[in-house]
Amino acid sequence: NKGLSDTLKLHFPDILLFPRPVVGEQGIQDPSWLTGFVDGEGFFYVKSLKNKRYSSGFNVTMVFSISQHVRDEALLTKFIDYLGCGRIERASTRPDIVNFSVSKFSNIKEKVIPFFQSCSLHGIKHMDYLDFVKVAKIVEVKGHLTPEGINKINSLKSGMNSSRIYN
């Protein structure tokens, strides 16, 4: 949000602008708050890219991510502090967006998954998380290095996020 345009300011001179508070000045106090935030703004996804260097012919990467406007970058930094992992990057396609993401498998396995096991997501996001956990279990036992494992991962992946079919 870049505020009111000059034209709007000219036509509505009596409008008082309310300053937006800076989000993220405090740490995350309650794990349920973080879970609720992820329910609304986060996502779990799996990338499987063709790569001949792998015995299965695919490289599998798991990512937990939250995207926000750049003004909320300080808030995303608090997620790194709270979870003890992740990184912040500017979105390559939109300069006003920053992404918090965790893609290192050990951090997903040891920090992200246990956090959401102890503080459950709700609704559709929970279903995506459960599929994400299934993929993690396949990767953990090196199933992603086999054609059968890749097929299972691709099947799970094809039903996650916006590709999920609702009954």
Feature-to-residue mapping (PLM):
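Sequence-level preference for short, compositionally simple segments enriched
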Residues: 1-167
